[in-house]
């Protein structure tokens, strides 16, 4: 996966250990992929996909802590965190606007790191599209609804190319936790290259 993707979102509030995260960072660095922080609500039981009523100041500090820990591991391989992409329920909370979104934006401002979100977010520095997630309008279909995840590599590639054509989409996401994630990622990258796109990291 690391040789297919040009940027790697490293989750650390929702799963994993310092050792597994260090291994992920090492693999991404070896492949030449950009490294982004993928902070979440502190929700290991729900893999960061359960909404939390975390107070804004506490949430800001949680994000600062998670990104800071990842950056320390990046320094160990001569790299740095290059952007922040919130994970799961935190991502959706930010897209809804409000105080939790302000808290994450404040953390990104203090860290002087860009925020990667869906392009309609007022806090997005860079906009992203999702190749293997179904949309309802401009938002992602909730994962608990039928058809929320696109498993067909050809359909994911087709959607990735359509999303890339939008002026405000700078990068295409493929989740790495699906059973056929590598096959889908290969198809999406091949589709983009066939369509004439120069596939490289949006923060390189």
Residue locations for each model-derived region?
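Acidic (Asp/Glu)-rich catalytic clusters
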Residues: 1-3, 23-36, 75-78, 165
């Amino acid at each position: 996966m690391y040789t297919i993707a040009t940027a790697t979102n490293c989750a650390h509030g929702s799963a994993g250990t310092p050792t597994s995260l260090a291994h992920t960072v090492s693999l991404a660095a070896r492949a030449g992929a950009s490294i982004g922080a993928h902070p979440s609500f502190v929700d290991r039981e729900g893999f960061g996909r359960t909404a939390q009523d975390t107070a804004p100041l506490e949430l800001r500090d949680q994000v600062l802590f998670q990104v800071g820990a990842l950056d320390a591991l990046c320094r160990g391989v001569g790299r740095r965190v290059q952007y922040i992409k919130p994970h799961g329920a935190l991502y959706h909370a930010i897209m809804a606007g409000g105080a939790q979104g302000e808290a994450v934006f404040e953390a990104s401002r203090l860290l002087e790191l860009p925020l990667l979100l869906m392009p309609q977010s007022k806090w997005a520095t860079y906009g992203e599209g999702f190749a293997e997630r179904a949309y309802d309008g401009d938002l992602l279909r909730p994962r608990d609804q039928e058809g929320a995840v696109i498993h067909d590599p050809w359909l994911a590639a087709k959607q990735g190319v359509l999303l890339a054509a939008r002026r405000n989409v700078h990068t295409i996401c493929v989740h790495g936790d699906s059973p056929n994630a590598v096959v889908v990622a290969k198809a999406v990258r091949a589709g983009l290259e066939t369509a004439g796109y120069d596939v490289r990291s949006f923060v390189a």
